[in-house]
């Protein structure tokens, strides 16, 4: 019951909040308006390297490159749900665990958080 309430509350807040990229339209897709969501530099293929499939959601181009950099280095945590949902939308094969890449203790002290640990917890 509490989970349902939280989901409804989140949807309500999202429907009146501005898009995280353009700030103009209302959020419709994981914190973005439909125009910004459609204009993300989607990568619609798998990359094969050394007989392994590598899944990648986007080309590292604007605006996704800015989203990643500001989330990672400028503590803009409002992007955490967007990045987690983009990864979830990859339709990953059945996995048993998601393991964030560890960062050095110095980087952790500098940033104050492990950005991928936050995303892994959301996923």
What are the language-model segments listed below?
Residues 1-123:
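Glycine-rich phosphate/pyrophosphate-handling loop used in enzymes and phosphotransfer proteins
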């Amino acid at each position: 019951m509490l989970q349902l309430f939280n989901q409804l509350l989140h949807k309500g807040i999202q429907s009146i909040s501005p898009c995280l990229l353009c700030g103009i339209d209302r959020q419709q897709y994981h914190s973005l308006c439909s125009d910004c969501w459609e204009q993300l530099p989607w990568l619609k293929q798998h990359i094969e390297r050394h007989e392994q499939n590598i899944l990648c959601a986007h080309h590292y181009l604007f605006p996704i490159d800015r989203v990643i950099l500001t989330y990672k280095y400028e503590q803009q945590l409002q992007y955490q749900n967007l990045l987690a949902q983009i990864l979830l939308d990859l339709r990953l094969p059945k996995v048993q665990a998601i393991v964030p890449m560890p960062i050095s203790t110095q980087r952790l002290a500098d940033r104050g958080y492990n950005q991928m640990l936050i995303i892994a917890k959301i996923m």
